[in-house]
Amino acid sequence: MSTRQYAFSWDYVGNVHDGRPNLGNSARIEVYRLFQYTLRDVIEARYGTAESEEVMRESGKLAGQKFCERFVGRRERFDDFVAAAQKALLDFGIGIMRIESADYETLHFTLTVAEDLDCSGLPDKDHTV
């Protein structure tokens, strides 16, 4: 059985307060996107488009789960969960989340995230980024 070296841990995020006492926890979005899209480029070149999309989707899901566990938490009421998620996304500068429609009987929800960290301001492409 192999031991994984990079299984996610908040230890990899580190103590930003101690590590960046002068620069703090902010960096420009261009730097975040530079890393994201060059990583995607390398994954696609090595494993193909379909696999790169799957890796990005899976890592985004894991990041969302970890973010939610740490910064949103469980709530008894759905409306309280949404409010906490909206606040966390706004506080971290990730985006402005809105519930556009909600059907509590079928549990179908449409939400949008305006000014999102990943792609707001990108030119339109003929494919999903």
Which residue stretches match the model-derived regions?
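N-terminal accessory segment detector
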Residues: M1-T128
